[in-house]
Amino acid sequence: MATSTMALSSSTFAGKAVKLSPSSSEITGNGRVTMRKTATKAKPASSGSPWYGPDRVKYLGPFSGESPSYLTGEFPGDYGWDTAGLSADPETFAKNRELEVIHCRWAMLGALGCVFPELLARNGVKFGEAVWFKAGSQIFSEGGLDYLGNPSLVHAQSILAIWACQVVLMGAVEGYRIAGGPLGEVVDPLYPGGSFDPLGLADDPEAFAELKVKEIKNGRLAMFSMFGFFVQAIVTGKGPLENLADHLADPVNNNAWAFATNFVPGK
């Protein structure tokens, strides 16, 4: 996760831009609609955007120094920082950028899934185990796992069945995102649009470019959050909101330094 946070590229989108309308042959030739076409060269969303181009926001503001020549501000999330040279090779740049965006999306969903059930439980909503790393383990109990604490919804007793469902359902969605499906072909798997954008949020190019920046910024924060949730679970055995409540109640004794100096694995 930490590695993907530093990655800045996508194998399928590097060096490409959105073409808003398909050609007539795409519409009438084979009866299928292409979700989003790409051209050969990416074009900045707006000359006045603070997030793109040579005058974009940098990682240390006016103290950032000169950015590497290969970080031109063409892609969202490029703050001109690559101390380790991870993006120097164009193919690696493209691959890492795609990995980062996908991990960002998973991390945002994961962070919400870790916090929201615990938030509901702390406000009186009863639906079984709310702590994220404890909820899944209930499937190994004798009674199995009831989704939302209601056996009439989904009652799971087999981890293999859950795994198979995940593979089939998520595999189908990912396959559609990458290779297209009955609702249309996908040319840009990283930003497929079409059925993946039912609200039409990407219809306006400038708004779409800004949304890409918001996505990558929030996704990076979410990846760090998930890493923090993992560490908290191992060290304290509690959920993130319970840890936060403990810290606010007694910040002197409940903080990262106090746990780091007293942590003994297995206890």
Curated annotation (Swiss-Prot):
Binding-site residues, chlorophyll b 1: 59
Residues with the Phosphothreonine modification: 38
Binding site for chlorophyll a 2: 103
Location of this chain's protein in the cell: Plastid, Chloroplast thylakoid membrane
Listed GO biological process terms: photosynthesis, light harvesting in photosystem I; response to light stimulus
Chain sites annotated for binding chlorophyll a 1: 81, 87, 100, 220
Residues that, per the record, bind chlorophyll a 5: 214, 232
Protein family membership: Belongs to the light-harvesting chlorophyll a/b-binding (LHC) protein family.
Protein name as catalogued: Chlorophyll a-b binding protein 3C, chloroplastic
